[in-house]
Structure formats: structure tokens, C-alpha cells
Design a protein with these regions (language model features):
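Conserved core of the PLP fold type I
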Residues: 59-184, 189, 195-211, 282, ...
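N-terminal small-domain helix-loop-helix segment of the aminotransferase-like
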Residues: 10-97, 267, 332, 373-376
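A non-catalytic, amphipathic alpha-helix used as a structural packing/dimerization or gating element
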Residues: 71, 242-245, 276-288, 362
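Conserved glycine-rich beta-strand-loop-beta hairpin in the small C-terminal domain of fold type I
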Residues: 121, 263, 280-290, 300-314
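Conserved PLP-binding active-site segment of the aspartate aminotransferase-like
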Residues: 33, 235, 312-317, 333-370
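Inter-domain helical "communication" segments and dimerization helices
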Residues: 199, 264-273, 294-299, 321, ...
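Conserved core segment of the aminotransferase class I/II
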Residues: 210, 215-280
Length: 376
């Protein structure tokens, strides 16, 4: 456990480093840093056709309900019921401007000042929590979590292809976490950004299905297009009114046009057929990156993920120092230090979805040369 002051300084340093990566990125930079989907897989033609239909309705440019347009909420609720086995109604869905906004909305509606996170954890969530002056406590094992959870704090968890570790909670761990939360009457924020990105298209039911005092976050960013900034919160109906007050104070409502665009896209296309294509393409890219690591940097130890967008592993030395050297040679990746509250690390995260096959190979070969020069 770390003091609020130490954690705040640490988070600000990490955000500064993320900005350093972005600022230093040139056109010829090979970036394995961001969680960017493969733009070649964006359904441009389908969205273009959908947009023409949407523009025939002048309501697409009008204000709309803060909770989100009803037909889109119905479709999202149907995904929970039919694909996740988690019975859900449209009244239990709130549309957000990207799932990132969900952190702000939820935390402004709750009185919890302390948030428990898995170590390592998603930098975007850590940054959002600190901007709201929340105390962050991390844990590694469930025994630690049992001692930390109480009725006045909440747990933030990514149960599928965790960012950055790529870990997936098995059914036993999901049940254990639900039981721990239930025994202590705590609150769960479960981030489901990657839950559909399973290379074998096998979807697990979220922890939230097992525990009602929960908020499950979803997003179209990884499965349709991130630029539309469309996400959602799934929670019990009695929580929605509290969330609406916070949502209205932020942006009144999520873009009407973008909601209607996604809604029309879902009317005319099979979303899960599209997701299956994404998973097949990502699995091939992951295998290729893994092959390149084994060939050119065999000292980088990792386990191949079964889904998601990242390979996470460990070098023989401080990954932050290596990342800064690599950035000077226009190779970007994220050292794991930014995902920890206050810890140096040899671990690192590499995105395999954004760059081409050619650049994956070239980038890892260049990184291998940088490591060789460092060792000499």
C-alpha cells in the first residue's frame, strides 16, 4: 500500500512518459506502444452505407437522451443476454463516450475514495482514478485482496486479456472474486474492453454476472472503430439514475449521430461475424510477432496470449531504460513500470494489431540490435 502523495506523483510521471512516447513518434516510427486496432479491419464500406441511411433521419443531428438511444441499448442488452448468458434489459445500459468516460461517471456517482487494482493495471484507469483524487491500492494474489476489500472501497478488474498482462481469469477465480466482494459488500468495476477478442471466439461470462453490485464496461472501440468513441456501462437499474446525473454534468449525452450510426450498422450486419474476422487476423499477427521474438530476441520471455491485442513479457534488464533507447531509434513499446503504482520492472507490453507484418519483423530486428549494442 502506498500513500496518496507517492501514488499521485507516480501516476503523473507515468502519464508524462506516455506523452513522451506520443510526442517523439515520427512518421517512420514503428509503434508497438498504443492499443490501436488494425485499421485495415475497420468496416468502412458497411459504416458508409449505414451513414447514408442515418443522414436520411434529421434526428441524427439533434439532442438525444442522456442514457442513450433506446434501440442501441436494446441491442447491447441482447448481446449480454444471448452471448454472455447475462440477462440484461435496456434499462440496465447507459451509453458512454468511450468506455474511458465510464470511470469518471461511476466514480462521481459513488462515495468510495479507495480503489483496489490488480498489479500491474491499465494506465488509463490509474490516471482516471488519480485525477479524481482516489487512493489506489494494488494486489497480486486473492489472499491479499481478501484483506483489502471492504464496504467502503471498490475493486477495478479486467477479467479477460488483462491490460497489460494479457491474463484471463478462469471460472474458479471469477467465482472467488465474486464471493470475496459479496462477503464484504464491496463494489466491482469490471472492464470488458477485450472480452470478445478471443482467438477461438469463446466468450466467458463476466464476474458481474455473479455479483450484482457491479458495473460492467463495454466498448465498440476494439470491435468496430475507436474513433467513434462509443462505450457503455451495464449495471442494475437502480444505479442508472445516479450515473445519469454524472453523465449529464459531463457531456449531456453521447453523440447522437455516432449512436445512430452504430445502431444502423448493427441492423444490417452480423457483429460477431465481424469479430470472428478480427480474431482470426489478430491471432495470425500475434503468432508472427511471437515467432519474431523467438528468432531475434530469444531472451525476451513471454507466454503467447489467447486473445486481446498485446504480448507481455520480460527482458533481462530494466525495460524503461531500453524503451527510452529504442524510442531514439524510432521503435516504441511500453515498459511495464507505467502499469505499476510504484515499481521498476523488466517487463514490457507490445501491441501486435496496429503495425504491418513487415514492420513487426523490422521493429523487432531493430530492437534486437539495440539490445546487442547495449550489452556490448
Amino acid at each position: 500500500m502506498y500513500s496518496n502523495i507517492i501514488v499521485k506523483k507516480g501516476i503523473m510521471m507515468k502519464r508524462s512518459y506516455i506523452r513522451e512516447i506520443l510526442d517523439a513518434t515520427e512518421e517512420d516510427t514503428i509503434s508497438f506502444a498504443g492499443g490501436l486496432p488494425d485499421k485495415e479491419l475497420f468496416p468502412l464500406n458497411e459504416l458508409s452505407k449505414a451513414s447514408k441511411k442515418v443522414f436520411k433521419n434529421d434526428d441524427c443531428l439533434q439532442y438525444s437522451k442522456s442514457q442513450g438511444i433506446e434501440s442501441l441499448r436494446e441491442k447491447i442488452a441482447s448481446i449480454y443476454t444471448n452471448k454472455l448468458g447475462f440477462k440484461t434489459s435496456k434499462e440496465e445500459i447507459l451509453i458512454t463516450t468511450g468506455s474511458q468516460q465510464a470511470f469518471d461517471i461511476i466514480l462521481k456517482s459513488l462515495n468510495s475514495n479507495q480503489i483496489i487494482v490488480e498489479s500491474p493495471s491499465y494506465i488509463g484507469a490509474l490516471g482516471a482514478f488519480k485525477m479524481l483524487n482516489k487512493e489506489i491500492i494494488d494486489f497480486k494474489k486473492l489472499k491479499e485482496l481478501e484483506k483489502l476489500v471492504n464496504s467502503s472501497n471498490l475493486l477495478y478488474a479486467i477479467s479477460d486479456y488483462q491490460n497489460p498482462s494479457t491474463n484471463v481469469y478462469n471460472n474458479k477465480k471469477r467465482k472467488s472474486i465474486a464471493n470475496i466482494l459479496s462477503e464484504n459488500n464491496s463494489t466491482l468495476i469490471e472492464d470488458g474492453a477485450y472480452c470478445f477478442l478471443n482467438f477461438k471466439n469463446k466468450i466467458k461470462a463476466p464476474i458481474s454476472k455473479l455479483y450484482s453490485n457491479s458495473y460492467h464496461l463495454g466498448s465498440f472501440s476494439k470491435i468496430v472503430a475507436p474513433g467513434l468513441r462509443l462505450g457503455w456501462i451495464r449495471t442494475k437499474e437502480e444505479n442508472i439514475n445516479k450515473l445519469l446525473a454524472a453523465k449529464e454534468s459531463l457531456d449531456l449525452h453521447t453523440s447522437t449521430f455516432n449512436q445512430m450510426l452504430i445502431d444502423e450498422y448493427l441492423n444490417s450486419n452480423d457483429l460477431f461475424e465481424h469479430i470472428s474476422k478480427i480474431n482470426d487476423a489478430y491471432n495470425k499477427k500475434m503468432e508472427y510477432m511471437a515467432k519474431c521474438f523467438k528468432k531475434y530476441i530469444p531472451s525476451f520471455k513471454f507466454k503467447k496470449p489467447k486473445g486481446g491485442m498485446f504480448i507481455y513479457g520480460s527482458f533481462n534488464s530494466d525495460s524503461m531504460k531500453l524503451a527510452k533507447k529504442a524510442l531514439k531509434d524510432n521503435i516504441a513499446f511500453v515498459p511495464a513500470e507505467v502499469f505499476y503504482i510504484n515499481k521498476k520492472s523488466t517487463e514490457a507490453r507490445f501491441n501486435f494489431t496496429n503495425e504491418s507484418y513487415e514492420n513487426i519483423k523490422l521493429g523487432i530486428k531493430k530492437l534486437a540490435n539495440i539490445i546487442a549494442k547495449t550489452q556490448n
